[in-house]
C-alpha cells in the first residue's frame, strides 16, 4: 500500500509554492503520494500563515481536529510549518502534544530527515532556523502541473514595515543565483509551461549572483526569463514601491512577455500613516511610479494591498487613501482591517480606531475599487482578448477557463485540445468576478512559437550595400 501525504495550506502564493515543493520532496525521496483526505494520510502537514488575525488560534483549532485522527492512529505523523511555526516554535508542541515536527519556511527541505527522526523514536523535531538559500539546493527538479508555474526567486524581506511579521518569520532578503532560476524555468518550459510567475516577498529587491561573480538585478532577470524559449508570459509577485526603479519600468517598454498587470502594494494613501507604517515612501512617490508605468505601458492595470484602521488613522487619513484610489484607478485590491501582529512595532501602538468604523471604511474602500474594476471589465466588452487556457471551467466542466494578460478569468466554449495553449476570444459578457468569451481562433492560427530555419533567418538579411554593410530586417 502506498504511503499517503496530506498538506493543508494557508496564506500567500509563497506558501502554495512551498507546499508543492514539500509534496515533490516527500514523493521523490520517500514515496509519498498526495491525498485530499486527511483521514487517509500517514503524514499530515499544516503550512501556516501569520498574516491574518488570530492566526495562532486557527492553527490550534486545526491541530485539535487532527488530534482525533492521531488518537485513532498513533503512528500518524503531524508536522507544522510556515510562518506561525517560525514565530511560535516549541510553544506549538507545548500546547499541542500531538505535533511531531515543527519546521520553518527555510527548513522544509529537511523534512525527509525530520520524518526519519520521528520514525526512530524522537518525540519532537523542531527546526525553525534560517539557513539562507540552502533549501533550493536540496529540492527535486521542478514538475509542471499545467501551463502556468510559480518560481521562487528570493526569500524573506528586509524592509521591516511596522505592521509586518515577514522579516521575523521568513528572515531577511536572500536571492537565489540567477543560473539556478533560469535552469528551473527552462525545465518547466520543456514540460509545457507557458507562463511563469516569479515569487518573493519583495521581488524587486532581487540581487542574485551570476556565474561570473557579478550581480544580476531584477530588471536583468526579467529579460533573461522572457528570452527562455517557450515562456510567452511573465508575471511577478510581490513588489515594494521603494525599489520599483526606472530600470524595471523600462522592461515594460521592450519586453512584451511581461504582462500588462502589476500588483504593487501601497497600504495607505496618507503620508502620516505611511510614515507610521515605516513604508519608506510617500503617496506622491507611489503615484509617480504608476504614471511612469502607464507611460511605458499605457494599458497596464494595477492592483494593490490596503490596510484600514491602522493605529491613529483619522477620517482625513482614510480620505487620503480614497483620494489615492481615485487618482490611480485600481483594477482590484486585497484590503484588510488592521489587527496587531505580536512582536511587531505596531503592536505596541494603541489600537484606537473603533471596530465599527474600521468595518465601514473597509466597505467604502472595497466598494470604490469594485466600481473601478467593473468599469475596466465593461471596457473589455466586444474586444478580442488573448487568454492562456488553464483547464476546464470551475462551474461548468464542459467549458474551458483561461486568463487574460490582465489576470481576468474568462470562461468559454471550446475544445479540450486548447488546454495549455493560447486562444483568442471575444468578450461577450461581464460578471463581477469573471468574463464570458466566444472562441475566435486557436494558437495554430496565431503564428506563435514559430521556428525559423537558418535559410529563413538568412533571407531577412539584405545584400551588402556599396560600403559592404549588410542590414537585418527583423
Curated annotation (Swiss-Prot):
SMART domains for this protein: Elp3 (SM00729)
Binding site for [4Fe-4S] cluster 2: 157, 161, 164
Residue ranges of domain Radical SAM core in the record: 143-375
Database matches in Pfam families: Radical_SAM (PF04055), TRAM (PF01938), UPF0004 (PF00919)
GO molecular function, one term: N6-isopentenyladenosine methylthiotransferase activity
Family: Belongs to the methylthiotransferase family. MiaB subfamily.
Binding partners and assembly: Monomer.
The name this protein goes by in its record: tRNA-2-methylthio-N(6)-dimethylallyladenosine synthase
Origin organism lineage: Bacteria, Pseudomonadati, Pseudomonadota, Gammaproteobacteria, Alteromonadales
